């Protein structure tokens, strides 16, 4: 009888102190893709114990961002503030088992210990004054002082793990002082809550930013003290800005939802974020389904990745070009309305087919579509004077006359234009530019026959007649 492998369970555990930034979104994406690849479970946990900085608005921003990117969790969101009784229960068990202890040293006393260690050329740390040991007499308890609870970290040997991204990592336990796991008011600390959550939620694989590497040996030691099964850990390098510095607001948008506002497609964002620190051969473009199919931790990069706005624009432009015109129209329509345009004024799907090859974002598409979706404004006098010369007006009148009984397809319009050019000995710009100026009030548009077809025969003839 063969045993069934345990279900892989990953988690994303943001702190709701602001929006979901790009680094967090990429970490969530890797955890989501890993779980999906293995038919596992992706858990969302909100680490909201920082009461001063955590807000409901930030929680909602995280949920909105994940929903936009299509990374819905299988379980959660779970909130740490709703699990306080469980944390206190485990702390009580650890105190009972002797793997944690009360420490009455004041913050000033601990700082003095750290300074003394620095003076001796040692790593600054708590010196274990209140750590119980066989045969050791502890100091008298200071009157009226509430203790912290510290974890009794091993004092010899090393704590290591085979990191899914970086390979073997090890810390000498002498470098790790006894971590505070509960504050004087009894509230548990971040590193402790994370451990209990991962244990209770059965997390098997932790993918997170490499700023957490120093937390990992402490968390492993607490898990061992609890008799828990250890998850596998992987630490992903940070994202750098185009200048090689850590990505920050000065490099532009770092809030995921700002990219939605700027007209980036979630499909493109998922593709770009995944490629930023993970690879599948030379494939630059892949669907969400392909990401899930191909994802593995062996191809996560050990070195930092560089944010490249031009590359993101290239990826987004690809997805815009590939998208079905009707679907694209549905996504662009609200952006046209926000600009005061009427998406129903034109066959918007046809307009998308005409405009999308020139667009890098949905915002650019919406702006271009106003050509067809806003009330007609005659060309400015200066433009009309330059391009609507007497000769041009004669050619336009000829075109209008021929158009009266003609079919109004792009092909038929192109044939009309060619006939006028041939009969009058003109070159294309000598008719195409005046047509643009007369019909849409500007000199630059996509192919003039396509523009006229979309504007519609009646509107074109009315505008030419008004010259």
Swiss-Prot record:
It is found in: Cytoplasm. A motif ('KMSKS' region) lies at residues 246-250. It catalyses: tRNA(Glu) + L-glutamate + ATP = L-glutamyl-tRNA(Glu) + AMP + diphosphate. One of its GO terms (molecular function) is zinc ion binding. One of its GO terms (cellular component) is cytosol. ATP binds at residue 249. It is an enzyme of class 6 (ligase). A motif ('HIGH' region) lies at residues 14-24. Its EC number is 6.1.1.17. Catalyzes the attachment of glutamate to tRNA(Glu) in a two-step reaction: glutamate is first activated by ATP to form Glu-AMP and then transferred to the acceptor end of tRNA(Glu). Belongs to the class-I aminoacyl-tRNA synthetase family. Glutamate--tRNA ligase type 1 subfamily. This is Glutamate--tRNA ligase. The gene is gltX.
């Amino acid at each position: 009888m063969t045993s069934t492998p345990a279900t892989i369970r990953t988690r994303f555990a943001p702190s709701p102190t602001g929006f979901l930034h790009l680094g967090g979104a990429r970490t969530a994406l890797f955890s989501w893709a890993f779980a999906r690849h293995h038919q596992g479970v992706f858990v969302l946990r909100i680490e909201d114990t920082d009461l001063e900085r955590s807000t409901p608005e930030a929680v909602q921003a995280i949920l909105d961002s994940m929903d936009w990117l299509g990374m819905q969790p299988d379980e959660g969101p779970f909130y740490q503030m709703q699990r306080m009784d469980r944390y206190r229960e485990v702390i009580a068990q650890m105190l009972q088992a002797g793997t944690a202890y009360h420490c009455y040293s004041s913050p000033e006393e601990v700082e003095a210990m750290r300074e003394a260690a620095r003076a001796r050329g040692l790593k600054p740390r708590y010196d274990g004054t209140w750590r119980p040991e066989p045969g050791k007499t502890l100091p008298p308890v200071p009157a009226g002082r509430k203790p912290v609870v510290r974890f009794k970290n091993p004092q010899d040997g090393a704590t290591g793990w085979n990191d899914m991204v970086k390979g073997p990592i090890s810390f000498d336990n002498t470098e790790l002082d006894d971590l505070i796991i509960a504050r004087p008011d009894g509230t548990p600390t971040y590193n402790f809550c994370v451990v209990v959550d991962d244990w209770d939620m059965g997390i098997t694989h932790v993918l997170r930013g490499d700023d957490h590497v120093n937390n990992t040996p402490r968390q492993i030691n607490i898990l061992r003290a609890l008799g828990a099964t250890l998850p596998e850990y992987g630490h992903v390098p940070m994202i750098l800005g185009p200048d090689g510095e850590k990505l920050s607001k000065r490099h532009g948008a770092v809030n995921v939802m700002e990219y939605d506002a700027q007209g980036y497609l979630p499909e493109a964002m998922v593709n770009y974020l995944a490629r930023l620190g993970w690879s599948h051969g030379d494939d630059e473009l892949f669907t969400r389904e392909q990401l899930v199919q191909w994802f593995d931790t062996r191809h996560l990069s050990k070195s930092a990745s560089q944010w490249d706005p031009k590359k993101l624009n290239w990826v987004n432009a690809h997805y815009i070009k590939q998208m079905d015109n009707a679907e694209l129209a549905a996504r662009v329509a609200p952006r046209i309305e926000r600009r005061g345009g009427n998406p129903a004024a034109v066959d918007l799907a046809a307009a998308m087919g005409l405009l999308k090859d020139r667009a890098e974002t949905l915002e650019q598409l919406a702006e271009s579509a106003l050509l067809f979706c806003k009330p007609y404004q005659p060309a400015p006098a200066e433009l009309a004077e330059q391009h609507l010369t007497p000769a041009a007006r004669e050619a336009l009148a000829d075109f209008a006359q021929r158009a009266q009984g003609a079919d109004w397809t792009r092909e038929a319009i192109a044939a009309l234009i060619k006939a006028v050019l041939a009969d009058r000995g003109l070159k294309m710009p000598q008719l195409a530019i005046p047509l643009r100026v007369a019909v849409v009030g500007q000199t630059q548009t996509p192919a003039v026959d396509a523009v006229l077809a979309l504007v519609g025969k009646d509107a074109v003839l009315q505008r030419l007649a008004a010259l």
